Amino acid sequence: MGKKKRSASSSRWLNEHFKDPFVQKAHKQKLRSRAYFKLDEIQQSDRLFKHGMTVVDLGAAPGGWSQYAIRQIGDLGRVIACDILEMDPIVGVDFLQGDFRDENVLQALLERVGEKKVDVVMSDMAPNFSGMPAVDIPRAMYLVELALDMCKQVLATNGCFVVKVFQGEGFDDYLKEIRSLFNTVKVRKPEASRGRSREVYIVAMGYMG
């Protein structure tokens, strides 16, 4: 019985996915994912990226955000990306495959960043969801806490942080912490984000270091 439910749910999700206008648009424009349009909408509102910037992309695969960022920052810019999943190469993107929660992977990522601070840290990380919010939300919050820890280590003064967060237990405290570290903080729900999803994007600008 449970198997049939999962199958029906999966079929419904796939049907919605392929009918999604942003999925169709991404496919037509040969983009890595619909997430490209989420970041584009944020950029139109908040102007995070400029030519020559250095950007860290956490949870990068399949590469929609890295693809967008490198187009914004140009040949003189640099994207350092990390994901537990494989990602096809993108010109200008330095990709590290590994689990960001692993200390060795984190150290390898920090080595790639180097001593110079970065301009933007962005995270589209999400756990594998079980369908049980009591399990999924803490897992998701753990990942966004790690992303914020990364900011504290590598983000330059006045730098920006963009992070996908799932609303639920811990969200308000997390938002409060970000507001204590950045001059300007917005909570965005891009049009390309599915309406019934708990996800929102915290856009934080003016890191106080």
From Swiss-Prot:
One of its GO terms (cellular component) is cytoplasm. S-adenosyl-L-methionine binds at residues 63, 65, 83, 99, 124. It is an enzyme of class 2 (transferase). It catalyses: uridine(2552) in 23S rRNA + S-adenosyl-L-methionine = 2'-O-methyluridine(2552) in 23S rRNA + S-adenosyl-L-homocysteine + H(+). The keyword Phosphoprotein does not apply. InterPro entries: RNA_methyltr_RlmE, RNA_MeTrfase_FtsJ_dom, rRNA-MeTfrase_E, rRNA_MeTrfase_gammaproteobac, SAM-dependent_MTases_sf. Keywords: Cytoplasm, Methyltransferase, rRNA processing, S-adenosyl-L-methionine, Transferase. This is Ribosomal RNA large subunit methyltransferase E. The lineage of its organism: Bacteria, Pseudomonadati, Pseudomonadota, Gammaproteobacteria, Pasteurellales. The gene is rlmE.
